[in-house]
């Protein structure tokens, strides 16, 4: 059996409404679609995924006590510059970052994963500026 290599990839644009969706369940589906695993021509070493636009990122939910107990950490680069914020604080500061961090952790590390991540567009509100690409509504 010969290995199939996707040379030319047709990429579609999809828009996903994150309002009321659980963060982890949404992120796993987004990561899978960004990799292209839903396509028959999926090849692990080729970026075959689609472009995905996520709207209403500020309305994503988490289960249990994660709203107050889930903590995001980052470092400023200065000595003693460790910072942290709870899920609730992150949603109020930068709601796009919550979905971006969740999806980025599920993608491959390296140049191919970075290319896949660039196809994810996240917006806090209900509007996006990708109408020219004619995105299809994706119900997750």
Curated annotation (Swiss-Prot):
The keyword Ribonucleoprotein applies. InterPro entries: Ribosomal_uL13 (IPR005822), Ribosomal_uL13_bac-type (IPR005823), Ribosomal_uL13_CS (IPR023563), Ribosomal_uL13_sf (IPR036899). GO terms for molecular function: mRNA binding; structural constituent of ribosome. The keyword Ribonucleoprotein applies. Keywords: Ribonucleoprotein, Ribosomal protein. One of its GO terms (biological process) is translation. GO terms for cellular component: cytosolic large ribosomal subunit. Coiled coil: none annotated. HAMAP family: Ribosomal_uL13 (MF_01366). Belongs to the universal ribosomal protein uL13 family. Part of the 50S ribosomal subunit. This is Large ribosomal subunit protein uL13. It comes from Haemophilus ducreyi (strain 35000HP / ATCC 700724). The lineage of its organism: Bacteria, Pseudomonadati, Pseudomonadota, Gammaproteobacteria, Pasteurellales.
